Amino acid sequence: MFRGASAINLDTKGRIAIPVRYREPLQLEHQGRIVITVDIQSACLLLYPIHEWELIEAKLLKFSDTDKTQRSLKRLLLGYAHEVELDGNGRILLPPPLRQYANLDKRIMLVGQLNKFELWDEQSWLQQIDECQETIRSEELASNERLADFSL
């Protein structure tokens, strides 16, 4: 499971180094293979270990090509999907179209989301955190059925 936010750098060749604490689990459980695609609701990228991505592909396979929304979702997620492999230094290459989609520059944030990572431009991530905090403050959490019994 992936958790926590790590500030990392994008090198001049478009590579990022996955933090050391994640490398061994990715190598052992997923042979270092990751699928990167776009987040359809935010300007960030989603990085899935290969076995997690295969579960998503199985769901996408059931989508109808005649339903406009399903076809659009499938087109975006699969059209941008790139499989990459950790190199000997724990780095992966982010293809240019994906870097452009998420407006990634030198400083980026890798954010663990249990079964996947999000990859954000650092400034966009900070803005997203502010928006998340505002959303939480403005909501009546107890009225949300899924959050009613959530306590920290």
Swiss-Prot record:
Q: Source organism lineage? A: Bacteria, Pseudomonadati, Pseudomonadota, Gammaproteobacteria, Alteromonadales
User: What GO molecular-function term can you cite, just one?
Assistant: DNA-binding transcription factor activity
- Residues of the SpoVT-AbrB domain: 5-52, 81-124
Keywords on record: Cytoplasm, DNA-binding, Repeat, Transcription, Transcription regulation
Self-association or partners: how does it assemble?
Forms oligomers.
Tell whether Cytoplasm is among the UniProt keywords: yes
Q: Where in the cell is it found?
A: Cytoplasm, Nucleoid
Biological-process GO terms, alphabetical: negative regulation of DNA-templated transcription initiation
Q: Family, per the entry?
A: Belongs to the MraZ family.
Its protein name is Transcriptional regulator MraZ
